[in-house]
Regions:
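A broadly conserved sequence feature marking short terminus-proximal activation segments
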Residues: 1-19, 292-304
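Flexible mid-to-C-terminal extensions adjoining Fe-S/redox cofactors in radical SAM and related proteins
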Residues: 270-273, 277, 288-364
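Radical SAM enzyme [4Fe-4S]-AdoMet core and its adjacent flexible, acidic
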Residues: 62, 108, 128-129, 133, ...
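Short, solvent-exposed turn/loop segments enriched in Gly/Ser/Thr/Pro and often Arg
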Residues: 87-88, 210, 333-336
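Generic structural signal for small/hydrophobic residues in well-ordered secondary structure
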Residues: 40, 44-45, 102, 176, ...
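Short, intrinsically disordered, charge-biased short linear motifs at domain edges
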Residues: 34-37, 259-265, 283, 312-325
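Short, flexible helix/strand-to-coil boundary loops that buttress conserved ligand/catalytic motifs
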Residues: 52, 122, 149, 295, ...
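Conserved alpha-helical substructure of the radical SAM core
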Residues: 6-133, 212-213, 235, 346-347, ...
Length: 364
């Protein structure tokens, strides 16, 4: 993922922001957000096996006025990466206008969608927002993807969404997000081939299947498809080595190396990280627009509507949360991409540690 960001935004301003963050963290023990993750609503129109977020009569949606106010604050503080997911974010009717506002204020804006609601009109509106990246969920070829998403034409809709975005939003990078399991390696290979033949410019990203409270499925701990034979760890390792060599796969090598350990049953794929630095460079917002350094590690905070997000982030209470979360282990044992990609690649000392560790894992 960082390769896409670097492709368009590796400039003097970006470098200065990175240098200042590292100086503040290493010498002063402080950190303000560089990335922001927004769960803009709490409903979804699919019935995915790995996620229990569903439709309901009264969905919660991040108030637009509050979101724009928060975007202003994040821009002032130097946030670079702003990602909107859900739920299913395209169920929010004024989503394009929100994305356009974010794109005017922040360098890199990213949207995650299942592609189910895509039309030519929506694709045009999204293309006009100025966002940099749209991720479409596709877990393999038609049969497997439809099974995973609980909708008989999910593949057809996602494929159509990719086509419409290519036509009507050509300046937006499209990335196919695929759940990685022991049951879909051949299906993912087939999908990658189909993408290369039809949309050669499309990228792929792999997300090891994880059960976690963020997806309302924390009580589950195994994934099993009746009548199907799972791939061995050696077969998964072979697939991952292929993915690392594929220039269209945007996962970092560090992340993919750890996925082998994850599928081998490791309960901690970050053993070299004795404390979590994630809260020092990230901020997340729930569907109500409540901020927290980490939705997994602590509950979002109710900040008064007239309060400044910037003042809150600079407050002693927020810094106390950052310090407390250093010892949090709630995401250990999982392989959530939204946490583990950044944790393995940032800050600099973690990137160096994970790089050496990844090479050692390959040798062993």
């Amino acid at each position: 993922m960082k390769s896409l960001i670097f492709k368009k935004h590796l400039n003097f301003k970006f470098i200065i922001r990175m240098v200042n963050w590292h100086l503040n963290y290493y010498f002063l023990g402080r950190g303000t957000p560089i990335t922001a993750g927004v769960y803009i609503n709490d409903v979804c129109n699919y019935h995915c096996i790995m996620c229990d977020i569903r439709m309901k009569e009264k969905p919660v949606i991040y108030p637009r006025e509050a979101q724009e106010r928060d975007i202003d604050a994040l821009s002032d503080m130097g946030v670079i990466y702003y990602s909107i997911s859900g739920g299913e974010p395209t169920l929010v009717k004024d989503l394009p206008e929100r994305l356009a506002y974010a794109s005017k204020k922040l360098p890199y804006v990213h949207l995650v969608t299942n592609g189910s609601t895509m039309t030519a009109g929506l694709a045009k509106r999204l293309g006009a927002t100025g966002i940099q990246e749209i991720s479409i969920s596709l877990d393999g070829l038609e049969s497997f993807h439809n099974q995973m998403r609980g909708v008989s034409n999910a593949f057809e809709k996602a494929w159509k969404a990719i086509s419409l975005l290519q036509i009507h939003a050509p300046k937006v990078d499209v990335v196919v997000n695929s759940i990685l399991t022991p049951y879909n390696l051949d299906s993912l290979r087939g999908l990658r081939k189909k993408l290369e033949d039809t949309f050669p410019e499309i990228y792929s990203k792999y997300l090891p299947l994880t059960y976690h409270e963020l997806f309302l499925n924390a009580e589950k701990n195994t994934f099993f498809l009746e009548g199907e034979v799972p791939s061995s760890v050696e077969e998964i390792k072979e697939f991952i080595e292929e993915a690392i060599l594929d220039p269209k796969v945007v996962n970092s090598a560090q992340f993919l190396h750890r996925a082998v350990n994850f599928f081998n049953g490791s309960k901690d794929v970050l053993p070299e990280q004795k404390k979590c630095t994630y809260p020092y460079y990230s901020i997340q917002f729930d569907a109500s627009g409540r901020p927290t350094p980490c939705l997994t590690g602590c509950s979002p905070q109710n900040v008064k509507t007239n309060a400044s997000l910037k003042n809150y982030i600079q407050s002693s209470s927020y810094k106390g949360l950052q310090k407390k979360l250093e010892s949090c282990e709630k995401c250990r044992g999982s392989m959530m991409l939204c946490y583990y990609e950044p944790r393995l690649n940032f800050p600099l000392h973690q990137l160096l540690l994970s790089s050496f560790r990844g090479k050692a894992d390959l040798i062993s």
